[in-house]
Amino acid sequence: MKPRHRLDELLVSRKLAETRAQAKALIMSGRVLHGTERLDKPGKEYPDDIALTIEQPPRYVSRGGEKLAAFLEKFTIDLRGARLLDIGASTGGFTDCALQAGAATATCVDVGRAQLHAKLRADPRVTNLEKLNARHLAPSALPRPDYDAVVIDVSFISLKTILPAVWPFVRTNGGLLIALVKPQFEAGKTEVDKARGVIRDHALQDAILADITAFAQREFPDARLIGSMDSPITGADGNREFLLGLRKN
């Protein structure tokens, strides 16, 4: 019969944890896996040769951070020292990503309240503006007149409504805007109803991205297209999303 040991002891013996207290914390937080099975009892005994892995914590406070990180990497965008404006901040995934990438400050704007992650609410670099509708964003509502980088992740509204309201806050001479394009909120009511909220037609998705890109270039003569890409992560309901980047001349 194979020897068996407590799960917390196995983690320490395999150097997956430094102490039994740390091992217990990993187990109780649900991060210890055997294949796809989550092991949550520190004192339960298992065979010495059981396969164990530690699930790494997410890099950012929400999935949105991974979306922005992919765009920054693809287009080699440096946010070090940048002053960020996050429109539709919600939990703060974009803000968290930007700060970890070196942004100096972040102003978070959201029409809701009590959504920003506690980690970001406590960060002195972050200004949290709640119950503020970006469609009617006045300069007096913000701590700065312009920003080095503006990121946008909004739902249930078209970017054609948000972009004109936000573009004035992008700094001239190289300011950056990155917007998450969500086809389900850009398509016509007929297409959305037909698709039951999840746009699966790739031709329609691509056409929507092209339409938003053309809109931005038409409305903002001082905009230069950086590029666009598929989001590495789909929306909550499986919707394909895109990231679109512009610079202000």
Place the predicted regions along the sequence by residue.
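Short, glycine-/aromatic-enriched active-site segment of Class I SAM-dependent methyltransferases
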Residues: 183-201
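S-adenosyl-L-methionine
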Residues: 107-161
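Glycine-rich helix-loop-beta junction characteristic of Rossmann-like nucleotide cofactor-binding loops
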Residues: 16, 73-80, 143
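Conserved SAM-binding loop of SAM-dependent methyltransferases across substrates and taxa
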Residues: 91-102
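A short glycine-rich, Lys/Arg-flanked "PGG" loop and its adjoining helix->strand segment in the class I
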Residues: 160-178
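Conserved class I S-adenosyl-L-methionine
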Residues: 80-90
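Core SAM-dependent methyltransferase catalytic element
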Residues: 233-249
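A basic, amphipathic helix-loop patch mediating RNA/tRNA/ribosome contacts
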Residues: 1-50
